[in-house]
Amino acid sequence: GASCRCDSDGPTSRGDTLTGTLWLIGRCPSGWHNCRGSGPFIGYCCKQ
């Protein structure tokens, strides 16, 4: 899937590392967690 920015990745700027995986269907899979707290966002940003 596509990469997405977790809250722990820091503020948005050039050269950010995107450690999350965008999950569009339902919630994060078992063993993963949503790593993005808030904001206008489609789907979930999941991380193992």
Swiss-Prot record:
InterPro entries assigned to the protein according to its UniProt record, in alphabetical order: Anenome_toxin, Myo_ane_neurotoxin_sf
GO biological process terms, alphabetically, are: regulation of signal transduction
**UniProt keyword annotations, A-Z:** Cardiotoxin, Disulfide bond, Ion channel impairing toxin, Nematocyst, Neurotoxin, Secreted, Toxin, Voltage-gated sodium channel impairing toxin
- Organism's domain of life? Eukaryota
- Cite a single GO MF annotation: toxin activity
Q: What disulfide bonds does the UniProt entry report for this chain?
A: C4-C45, C6-C35, C28-C46
- GO cellular component: a single term: nematocyst
SUPFAM superfamilies in the cross-refs? Defensin-like
What protein family does this chain belong to? Belongs to the sea anemone sodium channel inhibitory toxin family. Type I subfamily.
Function of the molecule: Binds voltage-dependently at site 3 of sodium channels (Nav) and inhibits the inactivation of the activated channels, thereby blocking neuronal transmission. Has effect on SCN4A/SCN1B, and SCN5A/SCN1B, has no effect on SCN2A/SCN1B, and SCN10A/SCN1B. Possesses the highest efficacy for the insect sodium channel para/tipE. Also interacts with sodium channels in cardiac cells. Shows lethality to crabs.
Q: What is this protein called?
A: Delta-actitoxin-Bgr2b
Organism, per UniProt?
Bunodosoma granuliferum (Red warty sea anemone)
